[in-house]
Amino acid sequence: MKCPRCSKQEIRVLESRSAEGGQSVRRRRECMSCGYRFTTYERIEFMPIMVIKRDGSRESFNRNKILQGVMRACQKTPVTVRQMEELVNEIEEKLQLEDAQEVTSLRIGEMVLERLQHLSEVAYVRFASVYRQFQGIKDFVNELEQLEPPLRRDLERLLQDSSASDSESSGSPDLVGEYS
């Protein structure tokens, strides 16, 4: 390996450790010629996966494309960069473990949506609007209606739990009855 500063090949490894949940090795290196220190990452090289796009064309799987789309969808949400990177790592790992040489862009999009729904509903709807090519407000409404039942169940459960504990302890009004 060459030094990124002076291009000499006199490099020594100062430290090695597992990174990305064991998916890579992080090495801290030092050039013996100029003293420059830098970090490298080693990853397993998987078989290349070809993505079949909507128009039938094929291109190599590019995790950065997925990450960019997820980052756009997650702008101004509480989702962290680490969570976004983990989402992309999960998808890439799942595809590699399936040992598929080809995958459709539609399948990748569904995998992203499935994971975004658990991270941020706002990011989910943003990603879905591009991925599913929403044409108008009706498309947004339809997508939101599909998200609504789990939210309604969670809200009803929360209100029931709250009213049960309130009525047992203080005799306060039944919130579920007032808002049903």
Swiss-Prot record:
Q: Tell me the segments the record calls region Disordered.
A: 155-180
What remark does the entry make about the cofactor?
Binds 1 zinc ion.
Q: Which UniProt keywords apply?
A: ATP-binding, DNA-binding, Metal-binding, Nucleotide-binding, Repressor, Transcription, Transcription regulation, Zinc, Zinc-finger
List the molecular function annotations (GO) for this entry: ATP binding; DNA binding; zinc ion binding
What are the BP-aspect GO terms?
A: negative regulation of DNA-templated transcription
Q: Cross-referenced Pfam families, in alphabetical order?
A: ATP-cone (PF03477), Zn_ribbon_NrdR (PF22811)
Is Cytoplasm one of the keywords? Answer: no
ZnF (unnamed) ranges: 3-34
List the NCBIfam families hit by this protein, alphabetically.
Answer: transcriptional regulator NrdR (TIGR00244)
Annotated function: Negatively regulates transcription of bacterial ribonucleotide reductase nrd genes and operons by binding to NrdR-boxes.
Name it.
Answer: Transcriptional repressor NrdR
Gene encoding it?
nrdR
